[in-house]
């Protein structure tokens, strides 16, 4: 909200550009019904079920893996942020209205956080706005919101720019208002409370950049930052991690069963990255149906076009700029290419999942297509880097033509997809509990927290609260000391 207020106060057109990005991508939410997606009924039942439990004094911390579907449908998605629609529902608001309001909030967060990360990474507002459009209009993300209603994954995607912001600052040796270790702890905590699957995928850019930029991230201060972030994350999320550990131990057979099911056949084709216009279909079984009625997964034609334009500039010798060691673009780009490889159905996932470690790591994922997330991040950063380099090496007119073309392609393809979803998906009219379909939720007592919880659970909650309070006090005291040090240095 502070970002929006600052842009309004400055009278900057950036606010209206971001508002346009938001309105374009959130178009299917401005109706009085829900689009009938593959998992929207599940999510509506989830809200109503949480409301009933909360009325009885029980908070469901996370959703267990629905093994009946042979994949991790909302598996280990946290319910902390779902308190927003649940509390609105408890005030008497219509069920589908609170669901759409929740999605509107998620999309607004995606726009704000992605702009912040890109603006700090490239120090150019125009580039950041274009990058925000590319990130927020990615077909995979729009399909997660409206096609599959995989809200946990969409929520994790919205918070992922916080992790990217940490990487931008760490690689560039920049400092913000928050300490680096706290920023990383917040990023991991947000992903953990959103989706376990996105948390695992989000760790891929972090681990990859730690190896790629080991001089910046794995020096003495870097190890200290990672250690403090890990300790803060464990302490502040102990109330959540302890029940999850108990669940994984109690239902290890379920995890092993789901983790051993066919997974590779649900991977994407390379053609998904090259297709310009999707029909907004609902088919995710690409091995059996190919592209017939395929869902709109991919990075978008604008990012694909920028990638091939980059290759042409590189091989033609028109782009001679070398990447700086303090620029995170190159590392995220190579990580994005790795994400493309991991998302394909030709990657030997089924062979790897014969190992128990890979079964545990991937049992909460629905398909390899979730690795499109780092692919989108990497291509967005390299695309923004290309726009910056092109602006420096070419005339203002040529740079403006390229930027306009990128935005036009992204806008037209997004309009095509959202309109296809609106025109092709049947409306789902659900106002009250009686309108809900018969969807059975898998319950796990390990995830139910109430006043009658055991001593271990209450102790974990107390430690987490004390940890959060302690970190806040530490940051306040640290910020007070820094101005004093600056004053002393200036006086000296």
Residue ranges of predicted features:
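Periplasmic/ER-lumenal interhelical loops and adjacent helix-loop junctions
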Residues: 225, 230-315, 339, 424-459
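Hydrophobic, aromatic-rich transmembrane alpha-helices
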Residues: 235, 297-325, 333, 337-338, ...
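Membrane-interface helix-loop-helix junctions at transmembrane boundaries of multi-pass membrane enzymes
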Residues: 216-226, 309-350, 394-398
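Specific aromatic-rich, kink-prone transmembrane helix
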Residues: 47-48, 154-173, 205-206, 378-382
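Membrane-helix boundary/interfacial segments in multi-pass membrane proteins
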Residues: 45, 141-155, 257-264, 338-378, ...
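Short hydrophobic alpha-helices at membrane interfaces in multi-pass membrane enzymes
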Residues: 166-190, 220-227, 398
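Active-site lumenal/periplasmic loops and adjacent helix-entry segments of GT-C-fold
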Residues: 25-122, 126-161, 190-197
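Start-transfer (signal-anchor) and selected internal transmembrane alpha helices
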Residues: 1-28, 398-407, 465-491
């Amino acid at each position: 909200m502070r970002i929006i207020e600052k842009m309004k106060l400055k009278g900057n057109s950036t606010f209206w550009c971001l508002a346009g990005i938001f309105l374009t991508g959130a178009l299917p939410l401005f109706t009085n019904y829900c689009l009938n997606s593959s998992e929207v009924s599940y999510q509506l039942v989830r809200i109503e079920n949480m409301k009933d439990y909360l009325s009885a004094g029980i908070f469901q911390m996370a959703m267990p893996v629905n093994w009946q579907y042979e994949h991790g449908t909302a598996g280990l998605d946290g319910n902390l942020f779902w308190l927003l629609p649940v509390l609105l529902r408890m005030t008497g608001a219509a069920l589908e209205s609170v669901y759409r309001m929740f999605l509107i909030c998620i999309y607004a967060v995606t726009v704000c956080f992605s702009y912040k990360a890109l603006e700090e990474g490239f120090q150019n507002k125009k580039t950041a706005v274009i990058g925000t459009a590319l990130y927020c209009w990615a077909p995979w993300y729009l399909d997660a919101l409206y096609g599959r209603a995989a809200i946990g994954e969409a929520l994790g995607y919205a918070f992922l720019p916080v992790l990217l912001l940490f990487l931008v600052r760490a690689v560039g040796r920049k400092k913000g208002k928050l300490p680096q270790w706290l920023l990383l702890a917040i990023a991991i905590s947000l992903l953990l409370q959103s989706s376990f699957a996105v948390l695992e995928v989000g760790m891929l850019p972090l681990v990859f950049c730690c190896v790629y930029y080991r001089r910046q991230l794995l020096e003495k201060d870097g190890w200290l930052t990672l250690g403090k972030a890990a300790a803060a994350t464990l302490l502040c999320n102990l109330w959540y991690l302890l029940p999850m550990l108990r669940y994984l131990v109690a239902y290890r057979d379920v995890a092993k069963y789901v983790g051993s099911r066919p997974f590779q056949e649900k991977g994407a084709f390379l053609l998904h990255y090259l297709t310009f216009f999707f029909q907004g279909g609902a088919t995710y079984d690409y091995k059996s149906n190919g592209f017939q009625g395929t869902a709109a997964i991919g990075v978008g034609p604008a990012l694909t076009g920028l990638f091939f334009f980059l290759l042409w500039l590189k091989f033609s010798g028109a782009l001679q700029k070398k990447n700086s060691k303090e620029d995170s673009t190159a590392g995220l780009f190579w990580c994005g290419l790795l994400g493309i490889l991991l998302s394909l159905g030709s990657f030997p996932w089924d062979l790897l999942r014969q190992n128990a470690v890979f079964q545990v790591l991937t049992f909460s994922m629905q398909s390899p297509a979730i690795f499109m997330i780092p692919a989108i991040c990497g291509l967005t950063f390299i695309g923004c880097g290309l726009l910056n380099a092109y602006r420096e090496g070419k005339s203002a007119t040529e740079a403006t033509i390229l930027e306009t073309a990128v935005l036009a392609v992204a806008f037209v393809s997004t309009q095509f997809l959202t309109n296809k979803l609106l025109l092709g998906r049947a409306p789902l009219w659900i106002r009250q509990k009686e309108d809900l379909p018969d969807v059975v939720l898998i319950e796990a007592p390990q995830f139910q927290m109430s006043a009658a919880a055991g001593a271990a659970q209450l102790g974990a909650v107390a430690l987490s609260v004390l940890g959060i309070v302690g970190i806040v006090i530490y940051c306040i005291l640290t910020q007070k000391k820094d101005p004093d040090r600056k004053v002393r240095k200036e006086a000296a």
